């Protein structure tokens, strides 16, 4: 599971399971956090640990589809969120895959366990939604 959760390259991240890859540049790299500017997002990605890099360095941020939260209302968090709309939904019995087109143009895959019977916040095609993720949910890739 370490290769899946902590891939060391874009190739490994894409080879082992589904992944959303954000291309960007390091904005700040401190001991306890790094921020990454990504053209597809309105605000920098915030990661709650530093990396070995430098400002302006090209990196990728790998985020697994099951690590993303999907809501209709804007999350009460200062970073790691974006607005978009649901373009497609694939139902697989135990889970569904949502294809969300961000306002910046990038498409994300989001996986969720099916819980229709007790979930009051159901989603459907063309819904306007917010995607968000925690500060430690993704991996910064330098190669």
Where are these regions (language model features)?
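Short acidic-hydrophobic catalytic motif
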Residues: 1-5, 13-16
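ATP phosphate-binding glycine-rich loop
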Residues: 9
């Amino acid at each position: 599971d370490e290769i899946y959760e902590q891939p060391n390259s874009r190739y490994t991240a894409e080879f082992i399971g589904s992944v959303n890859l954000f291309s960007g540049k390091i904005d700040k790299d401190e001991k306890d956090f790094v921020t990454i500017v990504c053209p597809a997002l309105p605000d920098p990605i915030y990661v709650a640990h530093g990396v070995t890099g430098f400002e302006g360095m090209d990196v990728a941020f790998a985020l697994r589809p099951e690590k993303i939260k999907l809501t209709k209302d804007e999350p009460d968090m200062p970073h790691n969120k974006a607005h978009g709309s649901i373009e497609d939904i694939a139902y697989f019995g135990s889970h569904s895959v949502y294809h969300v087109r961000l306002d910046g143009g990038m498409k994300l895959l989001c996986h969720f366990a099916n819980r229709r019977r007790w979930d009051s916040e159901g989603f459907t095609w063309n819904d306007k939604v917010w995607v968000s993720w925690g500060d430690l949910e993704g991996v910064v890739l330098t190669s």
